[in-house]
Each structure stands twice: as structure tokens, then as C-alpha cells.
Amino acid sequence: MPGPLRVLITGAAGQIAYNLSNMVANGNLFGKDQKIILHLLDIPEAKTVLEGVVMELQDCAFTVLEGIVPTHCLKEAFTDIDVALMVGAMPRKQGMERRDLLSSNVKIFKDQGEALEKYAKKTVKVLVVGNPANTNCLIMSKYAPSIPKENFTALSRLDHNRAIYQVAAKVGVPSECVKNVCIWGNHSNKQFPDLAHAVVTKGGKQHPAKELINDEKWVKEVFTPCVQNRGAAVIGLRKLSSAASAAKAIVDQMHDWWFGTKEGEWVSMSVYSTGEHYGAPKDIYFSFPVTIKNGHYKVVDGLAMDEWGKGLFKITADELVDEREVALSSFK
């Protein structure tokens, strides 16, 4: 049996982490044969809540959970970690857009990037969840320069899963029968959810999703804004941001990054853009369709896009460049 993995969850006293820590500790992410040591980081003001989270994890008597390190100290949190699930950030509240969070969160991710650089394993895999996730991921990577930019990703699997559900519901199949939707760009209401290449298994056969749907108006006026604004819709109803669905998406994205994607299937993941794919700008974290093998992702190239799609692609790309400039200017 391999040695234990040290897995950091930040914002560990929060609602996403409350769901996520249980999913990781019960073996959903790395399997039932992989021992885990959970590093749980939150601010000192959350100390008593975090103690309660630790008690619950202990009381679950998970067989793969070998140890728990609750802390508000960056050194203790980041030392020798194999995986970082960066959930903690200033929360988004009703009426706020992710851009509004930039000034509050860039300093958090600068400090945590420096801690990652100083204390974590150089092979660490980092998944940034706290919003605005793509730009927080970029800031963190810039302050951990010895860790490859390919080792950082931002969460776009929640949007991917939302898109899959909408397609499945429209054509009347379970979600598992839909694959190869794409989320392009930012995790924001300017993302481009794309079903042009999605495939649906129905009646024992595979069909292009667009053929089964056969309703361009629905794609443009229902599906696209629904996925773009789903997070805000959840906040409007719960008065809190998505928690269980976000935790499930974190597990999905890291699981596929760790173990690989299925043959003939891609997933959406926000990865470092070198400017080589689809004309996306350099030096941002941009959601692309990717395949993954042996822990390494590869962007799926050659997918066609119509003029309407190209327009949405440009909007989300421009937003990410704008976010980057705002974030970097706060350090000047």
C-alpha cells in the first residue's frame, strides 16, 4: 500500500469544505486503498468551528483517514503536502460578481502562493476553488515560481457538471449518458458553455447532442444563460453559494486529474494558457476541454466553433485579461 497523501483543504471551517472533507476522508477521491492525512486550514476566528469539523471527521471513523492537522498557520498547513484544494476565499454574497472579490482575495492567494513555494512538495497538484478562481489561481502560481504552472488548475468542473445536467434533462436521459460538453474561459457569468460537440447515449446509440435537441433557440436563450447564471441562482434561493455541488465537482476534477479521463471522453478544466490553443490569450488560467493521462492533461485541439460561439469565447477571454490586469495592479 502506498504511503499517506497529505491533502490540504483551505477554508476548512466553511460549508464547501464541510462537504469536501468528508468526501476526501471516505475514499471518494483517491480510493479506498490510499491513506490520507488531512491538513485543514482556516483563520484563527474559525478555530472553534474547525474543532467541531475535526470531531465529526474523527467520529466517522473513516478507514483511509490516517491523521488530521487543523491549523491557522501557513507553514503547518503547507508543509510536505501532495495536493492543495484551495477553497478558502472571501465569500461571494448576493448581488456580487466575482470581479468584486478580486481586491479582497489577491492578497490571500499571494500569501498562500508564497507558503506553497516555501513548504509544499514541488510535485504538488493545486486546485483553486475560491473565487474569482481563475485569477486567484494565476496569482498563486506567480508567487510559487518553482512549481510548474501545469501543476495549478482552477475549478470549471462545476460548470461542466451543470451543463451536462441541462443537456441530460432536455433530451430525457440520465446525466451519465452525456459527455463532451465544453466550458470555455472563466468561471463566471461570462463563461461559454458549449454543447456543439457533446454526445448523448440514447436507445443504445450515440448521438450528437445538438441533433437530439434540434432547438437553436433553446441552446442560446435557455441553456447558455442557465449554466452561466446557475451559481447566482443558487445564491438567490439559498442565500449561500453552492456547497455540495461544488464539493462534488472538486472531487470529480481532482479525481480525473489524478487517475485520468475515460477513452473518448474529455472534461473541462481551467489550465494555464500559453496562447497556443484556440487563440486564448497568454498568461491566464482558461477553461478548455482536456484529456488526462498519467496525471498530465492535454488540451483537445481542433474543435470547430461558429461565429456566435467565437463571440462568446472572446467575451470570456477579454474578461480574464481584464481580471488579470486589475489583480496585478493591486500589487503595484
UniProtKB/Swiss-Prot annotation:
- Enzyme Commission number(s) of this protein: 1.1.1.37
Which function does this protein serve?
Malate dehydrogenase. Has no activity with NADPH as substrate. Does not show lactate dehydrogenase activity.
Q: Oligomeric state and partners?
A: Homodimer.
Task: Enumerate the catalysed reactions.
Answer: (S)-malate + NAD(+) = oxaloacetate + NADH + H(+)
Which residues does the entry assign to the active site, renumbered to this chain?
187 (proton acceptor)
Q: Which gene encodes it?
A: MDH
- Activity vs pH: Optimum pH is 7.6 for oxaloacetate reduction and 9.6 for malate oxidation. Stable between pH 6.8-8.5 for the forward reaction.
Give the similarity note: Belongs to the LDH/MDH superfamily. MDH type 2 family.
The cross-references to PANTHER family, in alphabetical order and at most eight, read:
MALATE DEHYDROGENASE
Record key words, sorted: Cytoplasm, NAD, Oxidoreductase, Tricarboxylic acid cycle
**How is this protein named in the record?**
Malate dehydrogenase, cytoplasmic
Any keyword Protein transport?
no
Q: Which GO terms describe its cellular component?
A: cytoplasm
Thermal dependence of activity, per record: Has highest activity between 5-40 degrees Celsius. No activity at 60 degrees Celsius.
